[in-house]
Design a protein with these regions (language model features):
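A structural-propensity feature for long, helix-poor, extended segments
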Residues: 123-168
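Conserved phosphate/anionic-ligand binding catalytic regions in large, soluble enzymes, centered on
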Residues: 1, 89-116
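Amphipathic alpha-helical interface segments
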Residues: 154-210
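Hydrophobic faces of stable alpha-helices that mediate helix-helix packing
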Residues: 79, 109, 113, 144, ...
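Long, contiguous binding/interaction regions
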Residues: 2-80, 84, 91, 169, ...
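Short amphipathic alpha-helical segments and their helix-coil junctions
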Residues: 81-92, 201-210
Length: 210
């Protein structure tokens, strides 16, 4: 669908946003939906700009955000396999619980709506509607990303409350600090599922449109 740049090279590191914008630019030039997975957008940017023609281009080693994520050794639920996540939920650990599961179910709903939008964007006979479906897919990807984030955020909020219960309470000062921390942690633990509900509700608009 056009001439592709060959032999481009990036010296040093590159912000993820730059590759995302480049990938979406080339997708629009091809009249394709931009509401696809981030990794696929990056792959399209790399290929379209010829970043892997001169030598292999590994986004994990060249993109700033990916390097920072690799240095973060904290275990995330969303990095587990479906089987592993289910088994972790079934274990004797109190987390992940219903909040994380609800966020993941919402993410799957957003993923399904986004899938239909992407399929529709290049369906034969609907060529003049590709931008409409691309916009729906973009919205679906945004909701999907937020709900996946909330999977871990809900468990993190629960763990904050558990951490407060471990705080000392021998003196009046310690009791006051513990009480204040518990109030703050409990408030946040209610705000996260509220965000999940609001975000998941937004998925219905996409599903209805599809």
């Amino acid at each position: 669908r056009g001439v592709r740049v060959t032999g481009t090279e990036i010296v040093g590191l590159v912000p993820k946003r730059a590759l995302i914008e480049a990938g979406k630019y080339f997708l629009r030039k091809q009249r394709r939906s931009t509401g696809i997975a981030e990794q696929e957008i990056v792959r399209i940017a790399v290929r379209s700009m010829g970043l892997d023609d001169l030598k292999p281009f590994d986004p994990a080693e060249k993109v700033i955000e990916y390097l920072l994520e690799a240095e973060d050794k904290q275990k995330r639920l969303i990095d587990m396999t479906c089987k592993g996540f289910a088994e972790e939920t079934a274990s004797e650990s109190p987390a992940p619980g219903g909040g994380s599961i609800a966020a993941y179910m919402g993410a799957l709903g957003a993923a399904l709506g986004t899938m239909v939008a992407n399929l529709s964007s290049h369906k034969a006979g609907w060529d003049d509607r590709w931008e409409e479906f691309s916009d729906w897919a973009d919205r679906g990807q945004a909701l999907l990303g937020e709900l996946l984030h909330l999977v871990d955020e809900d468990t993190a909020a629960f763990n904050r409350i558990m951490a407060v219960f471990a705080m000392p309470k021998s003196t009046d000062e310690e009791k006051a600090a513990r009480s204040a921390a518990l109030q703050e942690a409990t408030l946040y633990a209610t705000q996260v599922p509220l965000r999940t509900m609001k975000t998941a509700f937004g998925v219905f608009e996409i599903v209805r449109a599809m």
